Amino acid sequence: RPVKRPIDCVEILARVLKKGVKTRLIMVGDGSERQNAEHRARCLGIYDQCTFVGKQPRIVDYLSASDVLLLPSEQESFGLAALEAMACEVPVIASRVGGLPEVVTDGETGCLSPVGDVDKMAADAALLLSDEKLRREMGQRARESAISRYRTDVVIPQYIEFYEQVIAKQSV
């Protein structure tokens, strides 16, 4: 979908490669923008560093093998993809939109940027991809955050309390 800004991922990869960082982009998912992203990769001469795998039933397999997750969306309600990556010890490079700032702590569990700021996202990606110690530490903090804040034994009581408050207000 256009709001996910997959072409930004290709632009970010091009900038990271220009900085001399050896890496590749694995893009998971199908949608109306996939062909445009593939076309942009060809135009930039980086198609060979991109793998477009389409929709996948087990995203965790790809997240577990990733160094970073790029999430340059212009809209994001909660940020489930970010949370899934964090649970796999993968730092998230994302737009500062929707629920993402609630999930990703800038500079601690990932990096947040304004929507469309591919230069900053590329700089963040290049730094994390070229500094294994920093990437590993950020990934560990990401996992700790995901587990401590979003475990079922933490979240379910919060939902129960919320619904009890709603029901109590309706009874009055």
Predicted regions and their residues:
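A short, well-ordered alpha-helix in the C-terminal region of glycosyltransferases
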Residues: 120, 127, 134-149, 155-161
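A conserved nucleotide-sugar
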Residues: 6-52
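An anion/phosphate-binding loop that grips the pyrophosphate of nucleotide cofactors and donors
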Residues: 66
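A short hydrophobic beta-strand element within the catalytic core of glycosyltransferases
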Residues: 69-70
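Short glycine/serine-rich donor-binding loops of glycosyltransferases
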Residues: 59, 79-82, 100
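Conserved acidic donor-binding segment of nucleotide-sugar-dependent glycosyltransferases
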Residues: 106-107, 111-118, 127-132
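Short hydrophobic beta-strand element within catalytic cores of glycosyltransferases
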Residues: 91-94, 104
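Aromatic "clamp/platform" in nucleotide-sugar-dependent glycosyltransferases that forms part
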Residues: 55, 74
